[in-house]
Swiss-Prot record:
Pfam families: Oxidored_q4 (PF00507). Its EC number is 7.1.1.-. One of its GO terms (cellular component) is NADH dehydrogenase complex. It catalyses: a quinone + NADH + 5 H(+)(in) = a quinol + NAD(+) + 4 H(+)(out). This is NADH-quinone oxidoreductase subunit A. Keywords: Cell inner membrane, Cell membrane, Membrane, NAD, Quinone, Translocase, Transmembrane, Transmembrane helix, Transport, Ubiquinone. The gene is nuoA.
Amino acid sequence: MNLDQYLPVLLFILVGIGVGVVPLLLGYVLGPNRPDPAKNSPYECGFEAFEDARMKFDVRYYLVAILFILFDLEIAFLFPWAVTLQEVGVTGFVAVLVFLAILVVGFAYEWKKGALNWE
């Protein structure tokens, strides 16, 4: 197995990592670090913080976000299939129907469990 052909790829990856990491390290090493009470104090729109910034966040927002990502990815997988519909034939069509059936069953399950109700 000849690995010489992968040397440019390895070099490209190393240069890319170096371009990202070297400026960060230089800024950390060469940058001034003089903390004082004004810099370490919490700042909120020009005023001192009124209360603790950590507040409870409703879990339903996370659930909606996860469901959005799930069904958004479904659409992202359907676009390439729609473009190559003529080439994939009946086998590709059946595969996408199975994919959509699984997602519809999952959506119906979420609906039945009440995950989409905001009450």
